[in-house]
Amino acid sequence: MSRLHLHLVSDSTGETLEMVVKAVLAQFEDTEVDRHFWPMVRSRQHLDRIVPEISAHPGLVLFTLVNEETRARLEDHCRQLGLPAVPALDAVTEALEAQLGQEAHGRPGRQHLMDEAYFRRVDAIHYTIAHDDGVGHENWEEADIVLAGVSRTSKTPTSIYLANRGYKTANIPIVIESPPPDALYKLRNPLVIGLTTAPDRLVQIRRNRLLSLHEDTGTSYADDERVRDEVKFARRMFADNGWPVIDVTRRSIEETAAAAIRLLGQRALQLGEHLRVVVELLLVEEARRL
């Protein structure tokens, strides 16, 4: 197994670097990576303090630094140490500059400014936490998305991920013996999405859950036939109500959330087209009256 020391140097929170690294490392198997995280590096003095640590654990240095002096100093140190120093976002930034015909603003952490989008995310997170697992159905109309599914279909983590993207998300478990409230069937604003999965996969997940809680795995919660019935019941409910469905069997939380956002966008386009047709019909009718 290969082993790599990876140094992440950022003049902001480092969240961008972490996401880039996570996406890239997913393409490499049998690799052990020791990550060394160096956020908020905004001065020469701070940079000089971390260089000995980089030297003690030589490897790849990945950075996002907008200050030219700090960046040049890091590259110079790495050159002396014989280590590669890679700017994570240069290619994207340069491509955008070329297309937009303007230079990027050299200010660190601009994506974390407390703008309208920031407060929308905060509001979405508060809403989502307060509407987890079927709670607060009287306020579901305020949601952007409502996720429905049987137990252990990643409803809560997907909801939280969507909230961090700025989408108010409620979720509700589908239980055969406990029908959801009527409010679920009367929603007009939120997009209701059904989450489903392969029954055999769900059985394994539930058994692992019971084992982690030191509980009996022989209960109906993880029984093969019972789980198949639950999944079938939920799928029938989704079909009867015309709700779009996402199969989470082989999807990560991020992939499930991306699929949900895509469905929401498609609905917005459809509603926009529907509104355009309605307006045109009204104009035609008005013209006839005249």
Regions found by a protein language model. Name each.
Residues 1-10, 14-20, 24:
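N-terminal accessory targeting/assembly segments
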Residues 11, 270-290:
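N-terminal low-complexity segments that are often proline-rich with Ser/Thr-Pro
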Residues 37-54, 61-65:
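Metallocofactor- and cofactor-centric catalytic cores in central/energy metabolism, strongly enriched
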Residues 79-120, 226-230, 236:
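Ser/Thr/Gly-rich flexible loops in soluble cytosolic domains mediating phosphotransfer, phosphorylation
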Residues 122-169:
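Internal active-site segments that recognize and position negatively charged phosphoryl groups
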Residues 169-180:
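Short beta-strand-centered segment that lines the nucleotide-binding/catalytic pocket of NTP-utilizing
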Residues 189-229:
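A glycine- and Lys/Arg-enriched "phosphate-lid" helix/loop adjacent to the NTP-binding pocket
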Residues 237-275:
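NTP-dependent small-molecule kinase module
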